Amino acid sequence: LRMDPRNILVMNNLAWSLCLIGKDLMRAEELSRITIMREPSNPIYLDTYGWIMYKLGDCQSALFYLERAIENSGENVEKEIESHYKEVKKQCK
């Protein structure tokens, strides 16, 4: 990001990495929010944001963004997105 602070693929990857290790989730949310603002129909970015929201304890937002990720995937929904949606749906009853 230092070399190209506008590279949203790198932003998404960093946000995802921070989320996976559970470190600095607020920074992960901030980076991920930028990606969905720039590409609001990108299912990968929506999935990342939804999962971060889940990790932050915001089930309502998590479901909203994960549902959008599925909707924007068309017929080829990635298994990871489906898995995230099912996990959040199960945990956030």
Model-derived features: where do they sit?
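Short cationic/low-complexity microdomains
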Residues: 57-63
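Boundary/linker segments of alpha-helical solenoid repeat arrays
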Residues: 8-9, 42-44, 71-85
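Alpha-helical adaptor scaffolds
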Residues: 2-44, 48-56
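Alpha-helical linker/edge segments of TPR/alpha-solenoid repeat scaffolds
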Residues: 21-24, 59, 87-93
